[in-house]
């Protein structure tokens, strides 16, 4: 599996959040963490570029893998690529890189993926963060959690035996006009098998000590709003609401990097 690994040591300020450290040294507050950042549908590890750079500059280790069939791995797309494929992608990064005390972050569709990873290697994860993401229960699928119009479009694609589903324009994710051309040039069709698979979730994420949900309030999603209500009713979770569009890592990377450090 290909992935981006970043590792650097520095000190400073991210998004207005001060890190009290002498130049070239890390404070106890900024003790090194290991972040695994999982992108959402149609995206790739590329979308985390700025956030990863900011985390590195604070001395953290960052992995931003691209899931099978997407981004620079789009040549591997096929009808058999599904949520389980992507769960194994991330599990293998953790396994082959000998990672532990991982801060596992999943954006959007990535919430299904990191929930599955937590079923397999919860002992390797110290914090799990859902960034404007799906928060599945056992037997849920991406298709069932989609809007009626989107669900109908996916079902039609499945009936045609398509192997992928085209990405929406970047504007739909709330990306600023100046960044839309870049995002549009990088997004790739989502493997169709990721929509209908009913994955197994048996409470693995509940075993993780620190759990957080970040809601991008500028993105309309009844499903994500329901996740907010679910998290609010559970004292074991932290909830943060941001006034941004869906692609937070592109729209507000400074703010997100600081927030991830705080939630880690």
Where are these regions (language model features)?
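Conserved hydrolase catalytic core segment
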Residues: 103-137
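Conserved loop-alpha-helix segment in the C-terminal half of the alpha/beta-hydrolase fold
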Residues: 217-243, 250
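Catalytic active-site module of serine/aspartate enzymes centered on a nucleophile-bearing elbow/loop
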Residues: 240-264
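Conserved HGGG/HGGXW glycine-rich cap/lid loop of the alpha/beta-hydrolase fold
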Residues: 33-72
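Active-site loop/oxyanion-hole signature of alpha/beta-hydrolase fold enzymes
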Residues: 67-102, 119-120, 145-146
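Flexible "cap/lid" loop of the alpha/beta hydrolase fold
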Residues: 130-161, 165
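C-terminal segment of N-terminal export signals and the immediately downstream linker at the start
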Residues: 20-38
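N-terminal export signals
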Residues: 7-26
């Amino acid at each position: 599996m290909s992935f981006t690994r970043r590792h650097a040591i520095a000190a400073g300020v991210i998004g207005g959040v001060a890190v009290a450290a002498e130049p070239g040294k890390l404070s106890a507050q900024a003790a090194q963490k290991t972040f695994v950042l999982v992108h959402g549908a149609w995206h790739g590890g590329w979308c985390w570029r700025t956030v990863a750079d900011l985390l590195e500059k604070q001395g953290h280790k960052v992995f931003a893998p691209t899931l099978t069939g997407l981004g620079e791995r789009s040549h591997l797309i096929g009808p058999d690529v599904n949520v389980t494929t992507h769960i194994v992608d991330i599990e293998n990064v953790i396994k082959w890189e000998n990672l532990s005390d991982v801060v596992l972050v999943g954006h959007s569709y990535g919430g299904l993926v990191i929930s599955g990873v937590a079923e397999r290697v919860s002992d390797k994860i110290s914090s799990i963060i859902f960034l404007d993401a799906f928060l599945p229960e056992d037997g849920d699928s991406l298709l069932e959690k989609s809007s009626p119009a989107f669900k109908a479009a996916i079902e039609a694609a499945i009936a045609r035996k398509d192997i992928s589903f085209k990405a929406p324009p970047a504007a739909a994710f709330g990306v600023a006009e100046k960044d839309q051309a870049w995002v549009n040039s990088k997004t790739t069709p989502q493997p169709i098998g990721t929509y209908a698979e009913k994955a197994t979730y048996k409470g693995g994420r509940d075993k993780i000590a620190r759990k957080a949900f970040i809601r991008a309030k500028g993105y309309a999603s009844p499903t994500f709003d329901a996740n907010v209500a679910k998290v609010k009713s559970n004292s074991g979770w932290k909830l943060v609401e941001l006034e941004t569009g869906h692609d937070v890592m592109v729209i507000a990377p400074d703010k997100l990097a600081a927030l991830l450090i705080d939630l880690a």
